[in-house]
């Protein structure tokens, strides 16, 4: 059964990619450009990670859809796009079904559940959608802290300096958005040196 790992180039999905490669899982990766500001840098990191792991990276470019569900995101650059998973996960499920994948893996961690689109009830309904289309939707790390998944990735060979987390999409991480703050905390909690270059925006 071949799986499809949703890839963003961040700590979580990159750690998952290394973890599953080490375990010998047969999987490809899917990057979805849904109009996020950081798409270019995310895709860059995703390509690097997949090249190092010799994994196929599929890219779905649906950036035009952002106009349908994003209103003032450009006025709130430090905030993640609300409800994005309600859009991209069903697309990933349909994509997997069409391409013959029987499972999609989402590397969401415990901290992600504070966002509305990652609430347990919503994820459960998305899994039900997958069942209808006979595509298993797996969230194996949902109960784990980000720092634990980072440890798994690094122990499997991940160089975290190759990953990208910032919401702004600059060459260097801003260090202030919610994703940068969670990135910093993950390294601190995991007792792993943070190799990230952060901008000084103060």
UniProtKB/Swiss-Prot annotation:
Catalyzed reaction equations: 7-carboxy-7-deazaguanine + NH4(+) + ATP = 7-cyano-7-deazaguanine + ADP + phosphate + H2O + H(+)
Cysteines paired by S-S bonds: none
Pathways per UniProt: Purine metabolism; 7-cyano-7-deazaguanine biosynthesis
Pfam families: QueC
Gene3D superfamilies: HUPs
Assigned EC number: 6.3.4.20
Cofactor(s) for this UniProt protein: Zn(2+)
Residues bound to Zn(2+): 166, 174, 177, 180
Keywords: ATP-binding, Ligase, Metal-binding, Nucleotide-binding, Zinc
GO molecular function: ATP binding; ligase activity; metal ion binding
Leading EC class: ligase
Note accompanying the cofactor annotation: Binds 1 zinc ion per subunit.
Bilayer-crossing regions: none
Family: Belongs to the QueC family.
Chain's role: Catalyzes the ATP-dependent conversion of 7-carboxy-7-deazaguanine (CDG) to 7-cyano-7-deazaguanine (preQ(0)).
Protein name: 7-cyano-7-deazaguanine synthase 1
């Amino acid at each position: 059964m071949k799986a499809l790992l949703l890839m963003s180039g961040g700590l979580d999905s990159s750690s998952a990619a290394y973890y599953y490669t080490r375990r010998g899982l047969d999987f490809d990766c899917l990057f979805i450009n849904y109009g996020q500001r950081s798409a270019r840098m995310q895709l860059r990191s995703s390509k690097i990670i997949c090249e190092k792991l010799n994994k196929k990276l599929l890219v779905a470019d649906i950036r035009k859809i952002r106009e349908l569900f994003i209103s003032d995101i450009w006025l709130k650059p430090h905030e993640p796009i609300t409800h994005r998973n309600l859009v991209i996960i069903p697309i990933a499920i349909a994509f997997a079904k069409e391409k013959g994948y029987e499972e999609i893996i989402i590397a969401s961690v415990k901290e992600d559940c504070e966002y509305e689109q990652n609430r347990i009830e919503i994820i459960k309904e998305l899994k039900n959608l997958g069942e209808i289309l006979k595509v298993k939707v797996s969230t194996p790390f949902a109960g784990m802290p980000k720092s634990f998944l980072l440890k798994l990735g690094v122990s499997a060979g991940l160089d975290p300096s190759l990953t990208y987390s910032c919401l702004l999409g600059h060459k260097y991480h801003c260090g202030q958005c919610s994703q940068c703050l969670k990135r910093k905390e993950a390294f601190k909690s995991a007792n792993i040196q943070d190799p990230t270059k952060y901008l000084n925006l103060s």
